[in-house]
Design a protein with these regions (language model features):
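Short glycine-rich anion-binding loops that position phosphate/pyrophosphate groups of nucleotides
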Residues: 52-55, 122-126
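Surface-exposed, charge/polar-rich loops and edge strands
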Residues: 1-3, 7-10, 14-18, 104, ...
Length: 194
């Protein structure tokens, strides 16, 4: 592991947990609005979301808005013995392995069906880098689904100039903050407007 990753991750998680509730709510609302305006979201049929941990952005308004548009929303489930997450429908959400609600087994969809991953992260950088919680689930999952678009979202304070990266770290294609939408060309996934 890169020597700066662990202390940086710990600092970002602590900072995220300390974000005032009103700032988190306002930021989440702005990010949902900006995300719903993206042409890639308008064209998507299947989108993954996540159940937020303390201090993470609220995704329920995005989930409800996407479902109202007829988009299938999937949520991650940890699969014992695998780093690749399974994604299933929300109608069977229940407490899971990491203490986060996840879909019951049997509601999974193939990774190849997913158009867009909305990925969580403790921090992102200005070149499409993402830092997660360190377990590697999203890096393994994104590597297994290279054709799907990857969108990160964070408060502006968690967008850093640069994050330490290793070979297994998977980049994102777009980043949405309350004030900006950043587009990254490293994977060549975006043609036309995002």
């Amino acid at each position: 592991m890169h020597p700066f990753k662990r202390p940086l991750r710990a600092r970002l998680i602590a900072e995220r947990r300390a974000v005032p509730t009103d700032e988190l709510a306002a930021g989440s609302e702005a990010i949902v609005r900006r995300t719903l305006e993206l042409p890639v979201i308008a064209a998507a049929k299947v989108v993954t979301l996540y159940q937020p941990m303390k201090g993470e952005l609220a995704v329920e308004p995005l989930w409800r808005a996407l479902e109202a548009r007829g988009v299938t929303c999937l949520f991650p489930r940890v699969v014992k013995g695998s780093k690749v997450l399974a994604f299933g429908t929300a109608d069977s959400l229940r407490p899971g392995v990491l203490g986060i609600h996840e879909p019951a087994p049997g509601s999974e969809r193939a990774l190849s069906e997913i158009d867009v991953f909305i990925v969580p992260g403790v921090g992102f950088d200005e070149s499409g880098g993402r830092m997660g919680h360190g377990a590697g689930y999203y890096d393994a999952t994104l590597a297994a689904a290279p054709r799907a678009l990857r969108i990160g979202a964070c408060l502006d304070r968690f967008l850093l100039p640069e994050l330490p990266r290793e070979g297994h770290d998977q980049p994102i294609d777009l980043l949405v903050t309350p004030t900006r939408t950043l587009r990254f060309e490293s994977r060549g996934m975006l043609e036309g407007p995002a």
